[in-house]
Structure formats: structure tokens, C-alpha cells
């Protein structure tokens, strides 16, 4: 059976100019995937060569949506007035069972508000969270959540995030009990604000996750945890700082290779090492954050994503469809709730 992904083709800073070529790249690479491009049909059709229309056949479909959500548009306004936006129609396709997942590079707040309104949260989950993968000092990734969906969270919210993150990490890396860390300003028990301290007590009391204790910001990337949990305010700061550092490394590397010819000659032996380093920290490679905890799969691409980065976001959606992540979360949460009821 084909895995069908709906793409908000008008979303992001570059819209169809990035999303259509990325879609064609995905279809070439993944023969068992169907993509639905949602947006202004006349604009989208112009960007698809006739040879691709013929070769991909029914695996490539366009569904017209007359409106688009602006990157600075208030979420409440988009939800209330843009009922025929490419974003809303793409999410509706997931709700109606015509698509297994939705990917958008559009306005994050509007996407979260619309996805939550249309799809609703899974039973036992109070709030969805944004989760994404980050590189570590070895080839294994660490997944961090919440990256900005909830500025204010409760200890119970953080616990639910931990459960969901554990399930996703387990599926992604084929590990039985992913290590869960709670982000804090220190490893000592006395450190942290009230939210973190109470969440720590809750994590230790409930033995349903492999909780390893506090993780500091400077050890997120040291492969001591598979999942790091925090509230959305802190998580978004971690995300933006990490992206900034990665871009700084890339920029310095490019500047080094734009120096005089003798500098380039001296750097020649280091080129393979630098390329590996740049590849490992490249934000494009890790593009694709998931709105975890919804009755459906919604993946958020960075608004400024290029073709390569948007492809990565779509591949994250394909992976989650393969593993049926929402169903795994639903089953695990139901199992945990049943355990608590029996105690």
C-alpha cells in the first residue's frame, strides 16, 4: 500500500519553488510513497514537468486550495478565517484518512493551532509537544522536546512528553528502553525551578520510563540520554542556539576555504574531516520537527528550508507513517493509565 503524504505546498519562505522540486525528489527516491500537493493549482502545475507527471502518474496529485497562511499571521486569525488554506486542507486530508501525514514549512503557531483543532490530541495526552532530532558526539541522535509548543507546562505535561519521546526514540533507533533525561541547570537534586523539581519527583515515582535524572545543557549532545525533556520556552531557546552554532561552524569553514590559495593548500589534508564535521552538524539534515501527541502525523519543516532540508522533513513523516507512531503512543498511554487505575 502506498504511504500518502499531504504537503502544504504554499507554506514557508519559498513556497512551491522549494516544495515542488522536493516532492519530485521524494517520489524518485521512494517508489511506495504518494504525495498530494495542496495549494494554488495553476502555480503548482507550472512547476511540474510533463515527463514527471507521466512517470509518477497517480503517485503525484494536486488538490487546489485558494488561500495561504502568512508566516506572520496570528494563529487564531488563520484558524478562524483561512478554512480553505493549503495548510488547513492538508491537515483535513489527514483527518479524513486521505493522507497518512502532513508536512508544512508554514507558520508554526498557525500549524499547531490548526492541527490541534482538526486532529485533536490522543486519549490521555493533554497537550502536543514539538520534538526533533539533534546530533551527538557519535552517530546516534538525541531527541529533544518540547521545542516550543507549550511555553508553560506542568509536571504532568513533562511526564507525558517523556513517554511520547521514549516511544518515538525507541522506534527510530530500535532500542528497548531509551534513556530519558530532564533538562536542568545542574545535576544536583537541589537545583532547578519548581517545575523541574516536581517533574523530577514524578519521573522517579512512575517507573514506566527509563529515567536517568537531570541533564545539563552542555551535555545534551554527549550521548548520555536518548531523549531530553523540557518545557517549550527552554526547548525553543535550545533549538535556536543549536541552529545558530551549526550555522556558525558552516560559515567559518566556508570562510577558511575562501582564503588565499596557500591557505587552501595548507587545509587540503583537512578537507575530508571538515566535510564530515559540517555534514554531522548540518541543520538541513535534521530538518523536520514533529507535533507529537495528535491523532495524526504532522511534521513541521523550517520555514527557510531549501530542497534538501524539506526532503528530510518529508522523510521524517514517511518514517513515522511506517512505524505508525500515533498508534504506538495511544497503546502505551492506555497501558500506563490502566496500570495506574489498578494501583
Curated annotation (Swiss-Prot):
Coiled coil: none annotated. GO terms for molecular function: phosphate:acyl-[acyl carrier protein] acyltransferase activity. Pfam families: FA_synthesis (PF02504). Pathway: Lipid metabolism; phospholipid metabolism. It comes from the Bacteria. Its EC number is 2.3.1.274. GO terms for cellular component: cytoplasm. The keyword Chaperone does not apply. Keywords: Cytoplasm, Lipid biosynthesis, Lipid metabolism, Phospholipid biosynthesis, Phospholipid metabolism, Transferase. The keyword Lipid metabolism applies. One of its GO terms (biological process) is phospholipid biosynthetic process. It is found in: Cytoplasm. It is an enzyme of class 2 (transferase). It catalyses: a fatty acyl-[ACP] + phosphate = an acyl phosphate + holo-[ACP]. NCBIfam families: plsX (TIGR00182). Catalyzes the reversible formation of acyl-phosphate (acyl-PO(4)) from acyl-[acyl-carrier-protein] (acyl-ACP). This enzyme utilizes acyl-ACP as fatty acyl donor, but not acyl-CoA. Belongs to the PlsX family. HAMAP family: PlsX (MF_00019). Homodimer. Probably interacts with PlsY. This is Phosphate acyltransferase.
